[in-house]
């Protein structure tokens, strides 16, 4: 296999397929270094006497990146039904297997289009002004879709003899051959295909649609496909949900709770529902086999299936939800059987079911569970009365109380978790019929146990009651497996072979109760309730903060492994090219005479920089300093100000599509935690690209012509070379803000830009740091400041200039690239959440303007009370979906749903441009600007790669933000002292069964459940947001927003650590 694809971006599935010569893109000649030190050795795990030598972690993750992890997607037909591949050979080990149909996704290379058209910009820069031309960047030629399913390829579906809930197609279907099939797009509907277009023969189909040879090595795809033809069109949804039986495949009758097949879309199976497993002992299928991968595109085209990313509820792990583009509500997945072995974050194919039958089954199951729990007899959370009549305090079951303690205790904020009550029937329901994509190399942290948690609890109860049970299994019987309990409760228990456990584990398992291990899933057959996996390594004791941080990085999927292979070689080549061509200022504007300054997080001395340069031979040097992406210069003019924002030019040395570029796309973002940072770039290359004091630097520069009132009258973008004269640390700049002439001018211009943008002049102290939508992941994160509600004045001013630069670049991209522009957008909060936010504001004595994001920020900034402002921005932050990248062309009609609260003018367009050393999204924007400066067109293939990068980078930004907040929570736990047991807080949200408390000193929020308090009755007045608490003495305590409370907190060692409420005083 070609080296370029052998080390390709791992969120793709590449089979034994050679690159088409026409696909080759121009790239510099890479000269491999002969220095053996450039090759990073595998991370070795030191063996010890009491545990075996496991596969080294980095080697294991490298192998996972090149082997399959989709659960039981390999299949064969045995005894009349489709059997899991678990009998015999596990996932990722397909030796000596026959060529059989497969569910594994594959990717085919796209043919690049022939580019045409003349360059729009013959020079190396372009300018805009108020009267700028509206000439648009012409759309790149579109490749006609050649990926259609031959009608002779029949869908493997049979009428199931089992009863099944009524399933729904998404549009009326007259017959299975009524539409031509097209490949699927993750979490999107596939649009109708032109029936007049010819269909290719079977041998011309991409491997995505063909049976796959299991002898071939392959890699799983990610949550999206980089070169997949499935991005040929991102569909709008023209059809409607059909609520009647329209398919001749659909079985008669319902019975959602009793089916053992995929219903109307079942694969061929016998009526027995048992698998021999290759051993002669039949085992019952606990899950439905996945549909053949080759049948998925046709079913999507016929509106028989929908696709999306699976999200498992943290509050109730039996529930899951799939967000589908084109549907006005999420699809509800009820229970583990309907989830069908899919994991959090998987791209899944969903068949819609009858909502009434699914919901009735869920309510019946909840009622049965409630009857078994005597604690729940005093009250129910599902039928709370919210009028002015006192009602009995609802009691949580022991299981729910424990789940609440774990979910609410490990987060900094109480994020809006999906949880359905008895009166919240979903609009759509469905079940998983195939896992289409899964992030490769997933490794989970957790603990080991001999018994499953449920079995251990039963044994403990038997022991406490004096019943030791049967002793037949005690003594010489050695268990074949031990159980791995993941830290993330959404991940199922994993069965691990006993041989992989520490040698003394069976005889001394309690000694390992507080030890953190790493494990991965190898396979999950349909006959097993739990997946089978393997131990990867041991992190250490749970009370070690370094082990906690390592567990956090693994559980969130942060790529912290060293650079190796062709990506590391490509990084060295880029570093050498940067050194050899420095300084080639041809075509660059020279701003070395300008008074350029920059800001750094830490005090980066010249000695530290020199130390880094001594390690340039090692691409993974640990002597890293803070990378600086942006610098500024400001000069007064006769009518205003000349402002320059200079951003390091990464596109100068990174070739799109190179191994370095693909590895940067895989990592997507630098992760900044309180305890450590995981950079996006290799240390030496990042240091070479970083802007430094008294160093000549290549930049992509943006010049702003700013009026005296803060209005931007014109912009210029082009390549430049600068030499910063001064580097301020953030602490130093705060101290000199009013005395340093350079910083005073910086303060004046930034303040006027902010005043003009918001339409009002507000103090810097009222800056709403938490709800800024352009930098949610906080690349400027300060590990010493854990309160996210506090910002320094210099940081606010700096971000104002960067925000102006991002909006100016977004305006250029929108004008030139139109629907191909790489922009940052945000979904609307739900109407109900907007109503609650406005109601909260009114109860606290203010009114918010929710007509647009800008107007909301303006309203929040006008609130003088810090506490009220922080509570409102906290709630808005929790209920607003995270901002994402998008290219409108590949989003269909989703774009209209993805804008912010509203757009007041074109300047509200946003993108990421100013931090290319921290975010891959900024690198894509630099690529697009490079095309504009060169007057070139982007190929359709390259645009699809960028659309894929938008999906991946958006997901990674959310992960980075969650990791940041969790690291703050871990730091608060590690610094905990007995004096912090009682904390002063303010009520920030009120509900019938709980109220939330905000702690201003910690910047943290916790929940107080009413069943923790000694109460007899409660009364909730929803219209006024008042909760009245009645205790046994008859006293009444009124709780509403801004009520001062004193809360007793307690900490508990877990992964992540827990901080919860034990008592409250009013």
UniProtKB/Swiss-Prot annotation:
Modified residues (Phosphothreonine): 157, 262, 377
Cellular component terms per the entry's GO annotation: cell division site; cytoplasm; cytosol; P-body
InterPro entries: Dis3_CSD2, Dis3l2-like_C, NA-bd_OB-fold, RNase_II/R, RNR_Ribonuclease
Feature: compositional bias, Gly residues: 270-280
Pfam families, sorted: Dis3l2_C_term (PF17877), OB_Dis3 (PF17849), RNB (PF00773)
SMART domains assigned to the protein according to its UniProt record, in alphabetical order: RNB
GO molecular function: 3'-5'-RNA exonuclease activity; RNA binding
Comp. bias regions, Low complexity: 18-28, 168-178, 464-476
Ranges of residues in domain CSD2: 482-556
Disordered: annotated span: 18-40, 154-178, 247-286, 454-480
Domain DIS3L2 C-terminal: start-end pairs: 983-1033
UniProt entry keywords in alphabetical sequence: Cell cycle, Cytoplasm, Exonuclease, Hydrolase, Nuclease, Phosphoprotein
The keyword ATP-binding is annotated on this UniProt entry: no
Function of the protein: Required for the maintenance of cell shape during interphase. Required for localization of cortical actin to the growing tips before mitosis.
Assembly information from the UniProt record: Interacts with serine/threonine phosphatase ppe1, protein kinase C and an osmosensing MAP kinase.
Family as reported in the entry's similarity comment: Belongs to the RNR ribonuclease family.
Protein name according to UniProt: Protein sts5
Source organism (scientific name): Schizosaccharomyces pombe (strain 972 / ATCC 24843)
Gene name of this polypeptide: sts5
